[in-house]
Regions:
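Short, ordered beta-strand-loop transition motifs
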Residues: 1-7, 66-68
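A short core secondary-structure module
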Residues: 4-5, 9-56
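Alpha-helical interface subdomain recognition
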Residues: 5-6, 73-75, 89-94, 98-215
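Glycine-rich phosphate/pyrophosphate-binding beta-alpha loops
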Residues: 13-19, 65-66, 103-107
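Short, solvent-exposed loop/turn segments at the edges of secondary structure
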Residues: 20-21, 41, 69-71, 101, ...
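Short, charged, solvent-exposed linker or helix-capping segments at domain edges/interfaces
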Residues: 36-38, 57-59, 83-90
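Flexible, small-/acidic-enriched active-site or ligand-binding loops
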Residues: 53-80
Length: 215
């Protein structure tokens, strides 16, 4: 720290929507302390204004999927952050990030459920319209049984998500709850997207259908 300002230097990639934002919460090492497990860095949280001197929002990468938002690179070139912008006491950043992490994981889970529902809808519509051997392909058990499994998995994931969201409202959610929901929903999406692609076939890899964005 110098003259009442913290001097931040470093770089962070894959920052969602930074190009359309004015602020971010930054977690940075502000010192070290001796613990029973050895030297540990003190992590503190700051509210950063992207117009602060030394803060640069650079162009990031083009996503294979998730094209509805940008990801950017944040560069801190000796950025000067006023001391009053520290969120909580020095060294409180790790506690804060753990406090926020659970609800944030649920937003990821909710996105996965929504994308899985979209993939299922595309596959179901295709199976209801595409004809082979004189009937809709959805009439074949090799297609209809996987569709039933997909619907069941999505239902299970959504119920897990709703339960944890309810627990947040009640103040009883745990880190384990949120971690399990995110794990199940994200892996569920992978399975649903793959099965939807199998249902649609080669057309699923074409941009004319949005499945390739999900897969």
């Amino acid at each position: 720290m110098k003259d009442g300002e913290w001097i931040i230097t470093g770089e962070k990639h894959f920052i969602s929507q930074a190009s359309v934002s004015d602020y971010c919460v930054l977690f940075a090492a502000t010192g070290e302390e001796e613990t029973s497990k050895g030297i540990k860095k003190r992590i503190s949280a700051f509210l950063v204004d992207f117009s602060d001197p030394g803060v640069e929002v650079a162009e990031g990468y083009r996503n294979v999927s998730h094209r509805g938002y940008t990801n950017n690179i944040l560069r801190f070139n000796g950025a000067r952050i006023p001391e009053w912008r520290m969120m909580g006491p020095e060294g409180d950043g790790f506690r804060l990030v753990n406090e926020w992490l659970g609800p944030t994981r649920l937003t990821v889970a909710a996105t996965c459920v929504a994308r899985a529902e979209r993939a299922f809808d595309i596959a179901l519509k295709y199976a209801s319209e595409r004809e082979q051997f004189g009937q809709k392909i959805g009439k074949f058990q090799g297609v209809s049984f996987p569709l039933a499994d997909m619907a069941t998995e999505i239902k299970m994931a959504n119920l897990m998500l709703l339960e944890s969201a309810w627990k947040i409202d009640q103040g009883s959610v745990t880190a384990e709850d949120c971690a399990m929901v995110k794990l199940y929903c994200s892996e569920m999406l992978s399975r649903i997207a793959d099965q939807a692609l199998q249902t649609v076939g080669g057309m699923g890899l074409m941009e004319e259908l949005p499945l390739e964005r999900i897969w």
